[in-house]
Amino acid sequence: MLFRSVAVFNRTTARTQRLMERYAQEGTFVPSERLADFTASLRRPRVAVVMVQAGDATQAVIDQLADLLEPGDIVVDAGNTLYTDTRRREAALRERGLHLVGMGVSGGEEGALLGPSIMPGGSAHSYERLGPILESVAATAEDGTPCVTHVGPDGAGHFVKMVHNGIEYADMQLIAEAYDLLRRVGGLSVPEVAGVFRSWRGSELDS
């Protein structure tokens, strides 16, 4: 067994309580109301996964964690952080003996429950520790291969996620433009457009 329990912290205690009420039966969770209690509950060398809004919020949480962790511990930034910020933070934490892993995660809320696609960067040493855990929770391809691989050092994970998001948004734009052309140029009704989109399912145009 890779881990016996998962420590949980949110600065809004009510959100932690809602998670416990909803998913307590899914595993063994250890809720904390203070960040210091959260870090104290982790087995050494500690792994702390941060998933908050990119930018100042991420920086604030990482700064707070860095003051509570010890050399050899790992901080995983699983938000949509700009890869250059990840490179800067990784270098700063490395000077303190801490490891930062910038990790792209794709799948949304459904992926969190059923298995996401995971794109971790960071040092090879960090992935040796994280790899088995990530592979156990990631989505799986049709051949059973976990949808996770170490994509490179420092900000590589967030760089790959940035490219992933760019492709996804381009696909969404193509779908929107196809809808607009079918409606305004083709003169199709909304139900007719829906029928066209349905006919594309299972083909090379499926999305």
Predicted segments, located by residue:
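Short beta-strand element of Class I
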Residues: S5-A7
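Conserved beta-strand termini and adjacent loop/short-helix elements that scaffold enzyme active sites
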Residues: F9, S32-R34, M103, V151
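Rossmann-like NAD(P)-binding element
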Residues: R11, R15, L19-R88, A92-L98, ...
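N-terminal-biased segments
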Residues: S41-A54, G187-G202
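Rossmann-fold dinucleotide-binding core
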Residues: T58-D63, L82-A194, G202-S207
